[in-house]
């Protein structure tokens, strides 16, 4: 959904939310909004955005949740870059925000490679180094578990 270079508001967010199939969009507790830092700053200006002092202790540093919009938790991703007006990261200005609405049960996390542990002796410090690695996979259940609000003015 194109926000037309305007600040996010509840109408635009609901339009993006209801682009999801009704079996996904009907339960806000199963949804989450993932936003970039600039879009989060605009969310703070929305009267409909419930911050934790209003919404209670459900969002903590452990979950990363910073508030609610329309009953769905909001998460800020430092890895989500600003985009061009078309919602894609390009070589140009990249000065627009995005808000991604996801149906949380519609995503799978699995192992590409199980946990591998190695112990190495470091003679120069007379100590041991323990290293554990894992490769995870992340995939959607189907092609309709996410909806994007792009071209958000930040």
Regions found by a protein language model. Name each.
Residues 1-123, 134:
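Extended oligomerization regions of viral-like shell subunits
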């Amino acid at each position: 959904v194109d926000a037309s270079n305007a600040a996010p508001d509840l109408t635009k967010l609901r339009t993006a939310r209801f682009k999801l199939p009704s079996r996904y969009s009907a339960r806000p507790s199963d949804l989450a909004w993932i936003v970039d830092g600039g879009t989060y700053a605009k969310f703070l200006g929305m009267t409909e955005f419930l911050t934790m002092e209003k919404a209670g202790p459900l969002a903590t540093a452990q979950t990363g949740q910073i508030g609610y919009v329309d009953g769905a938790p909001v998460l800020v991703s430092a890895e989500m870059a600003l985009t061009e007006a078309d919602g894609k990261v390009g070589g140009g200005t990249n000065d627009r925000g995005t808000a991604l609405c996801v149906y949380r049960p519609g995503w799978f996390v699995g192992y590409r490679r199980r946990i591998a542990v190695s112990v190495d002796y470091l003679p120069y410090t007379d100590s041991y180094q323990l290293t554990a690695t894992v490769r995870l996979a992340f995939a959607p259940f189907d092609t309709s578990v996410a909806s994007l609000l792009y071209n958000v003015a930040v």
